[in-house]
């Protein structure tokens, strides 16, 4: 069989697209050896400057390492956003495609022709090859975005919001449950807008209702809630759910009224704080957010207000980003803040972030928690790795398992564990017994 090497860069929404391509290319053997691959696919990210640079660097590295006669295929957001420039500037690449044709990747390779269909690909009933887990899967619920954030170019190359049908989503989950998957993360650019393109404002509540009816779904969470489209009713429905964890991932980007207006976030600080307090007051809640520092217009007062809020509110996880000046955005034409100031602000925010994460982890000491066994840890074979049941896979942390009262451990199974230590932002725990 011919051999395939695929690299998926950027977010987990990109990973889903990569898994769809793998589903179309099941006549290939997957190889980790680039020099042995007959086809190499790079699924790129084009969101911010650092992601674009990583994508270009990866493409060039793949070209350097590949064997004669192999095909180098580049797809994804970077290609969609800069297709004309990159086709001219990357002679190393054999085939180009964007964000519209993941389900046609086999035809593109067979015909050896570039393809850029006009509409962003919206997943229907295509079979995916899930990677990196035998129990957890990401489920994409929509494509595109109708928001108008001043810093974000995603709507310019991903298009307007397009929601998958409830039937498509539930069928995918049912099929994955049959294969042994029991833990799901539902995601999109703006998950709380799900079905609003079809005139339904509580689409996410409807989705929760339907997922709860599926036997075999043990746990779930929703990623990328957007403040202006997140309702108190939605939060209450998540809290009431026996399946969906009280996991709230809502990037606020800022908390200063001035900055929320400049960033065109669509909701003020008062509403954001009301939503966050509802989330925090839920039993065993877990709150994740994201912020941007150095956006044009951010004064020292705005920045200090953000710092104070992050220190006071005690998020469990915070992702902090330096503002990236992007073409085709409202903030591109604004007066920019000097890079030195942005770097200094980011450094301060990162210290707050680290402290918040450590405090969240320290709360787990001595507790008994449920966690899924992942395999060998990032620290090597001395430890197994596990994921706490409420956490999202990969982004919320790793539990190091150093001892077990259970002799025969099964990768992907859920275990009751006791947390004994926190080391380098990782929990250390002992497995007590297998969950029922």
Swiss-Prot record:
The keyword 4Fe-4S applies. Its main location: cytoplasm. InterPro entries: Elp3/MiaA/NifB-like_rSAM (IPR006638), Methylthiotransferase (IPR005839), Methylthiotransferase_CS (IPR020612), Methylthiotransferase_N (IPR013848), Methylthiotransferase_N_sf (IPR038135), Ribosomal_uS12_MeSTrfase_RimO (IPR005840), rSAM (IPR007197), rSAM_horseshoe (IPR023404). [4Fe-4S] cluster 2 binds at residues 145, 149, 152. GO terms for molecular function: 4 iron, 4 sulfur cluster binding; aspartic acid methylthiotransferase activity; metal ion binding; protein methylthiotransferase activity. It catalyses: L-aspartate(89)-[ribosomal protein uS12]-hydrogen + (sulfur carrier)-SH + AH2 + 2 S-adenosyl-L-methionine = 3-methylsulfanyl-L-aspartate(89)-[ribosomal protein uS12]-hydrogen + (sulfur carrier)-H + 5'-deoxyadenosine + L-methionine + A + S-adenosyl-L-homocysteine + 2 H(+). The keyword Ribosomal protein does not apply. GO terms for cellular component: cytosol. One of its GO terms (biological process) is tRNA modification. Coiled coil: none annotated. SMART domains: Elp3. Binds 2 [4Fe-4S] clusters. One cluster is coordinated with 3 cysteines and an exchangeable S-adenosyl-L-methionine. Gene3D superfamilies: Methylthiotransferase, N-terminal domain (3.40.50.12160), tm_1862 like domain (3.80.30.20). Belongs to the methylthiotransferase family. RimO subfamily. Catalyzes the methylthiolation of an aspartic acid residue of ribosomal protein uS12. This is Ribosomal protein uS12 methylthiotransferase RimO. It comes from Campylobacter concisus (strain 13826).
């Amino acid at each position: 069989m011919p051999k395939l090497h695929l690299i998926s860069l950027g977010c987990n929404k990109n990973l889903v697209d990569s898994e769809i391509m793998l589903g179309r290319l099941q006549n290939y053997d997957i190889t980790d050896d680039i020099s042995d691959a007959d086809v190499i696919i790079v699924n790129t990210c084009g969101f911010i400057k650092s992601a674009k640079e990583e994508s270009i660097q990866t493409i060039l590295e793949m070209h350097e390492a590949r064997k004669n006669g192999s095909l180098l295929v580049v797809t994804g957001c970077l290609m969609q956003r800069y297709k004309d420039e990159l086709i001219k500037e990357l002679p190393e690449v054999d085939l180009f495609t964007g964000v519209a044709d993941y389900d046609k990747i086999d035809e593109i390779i067979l015909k050896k022709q570039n393809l850029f269909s006009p509409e962003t690909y919206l997943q229907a009933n295509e079979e995916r090859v899930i990677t990196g887990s035998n129990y957890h899967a990401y489920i994409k619920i929509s494509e595109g975005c109708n928001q108008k954030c001043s810093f974000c170019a995603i709507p310019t190359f991903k298009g307007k919001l397009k929601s998958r049908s409830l039937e498509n989503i539930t069928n995918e989950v049912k099929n994955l449950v049959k294969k042994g998957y029991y833990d799901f993360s539902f995601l999109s650019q703006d998950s709380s807008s799900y079905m609003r393109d079809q005139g339904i404002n509580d689409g996410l509540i409807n989705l929760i209702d339907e997922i709860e009816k599926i036997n075999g779904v043990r746990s779930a969470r929703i990623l990328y809630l957007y403040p202006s489209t997140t309702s108190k009713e939605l939060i209450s429905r998540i809290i009431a759910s026996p399946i969906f964890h009280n996991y709230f991932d809502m990037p606020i980007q800022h908390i200063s009224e001035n900055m929320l207006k400049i960033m065109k976030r669509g909701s003020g600080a008062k509403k954001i704080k009301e939503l966050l307090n509802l989330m925090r007051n839920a039993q065993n809640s877990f709150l994740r957010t994201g912020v941007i520092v150095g956006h044009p217009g951010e004064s020292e007062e705005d920045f200090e207000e953000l710092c104070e809020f992050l220190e006071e509110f005690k998020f469990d996880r915070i992702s902090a980003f330096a503002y990236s000046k992007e073409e085709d955005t409202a903030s591109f034409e604004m007066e920019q803040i000097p890079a030195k100031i942005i770097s200094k602000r980011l450094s301060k925010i990162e210290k707050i972030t680290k402290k918040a994460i450590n405090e969240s982890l320290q709360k787990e000491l001595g507790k008994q928690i449920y966690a899924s066994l992942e395999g060998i840890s990032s620290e090597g074979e001395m430890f197994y790795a596990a994921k706490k049941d409420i956490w999202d896979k990969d982004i919320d942390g790793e539990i190091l398992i150093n001892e077990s009262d259970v002799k025969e451990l099964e990768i992907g199974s859920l275990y009751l564990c006791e947390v004994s230590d926190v080391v380098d932002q990782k929990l250390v725990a002992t497995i007590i017994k297998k969950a029922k």
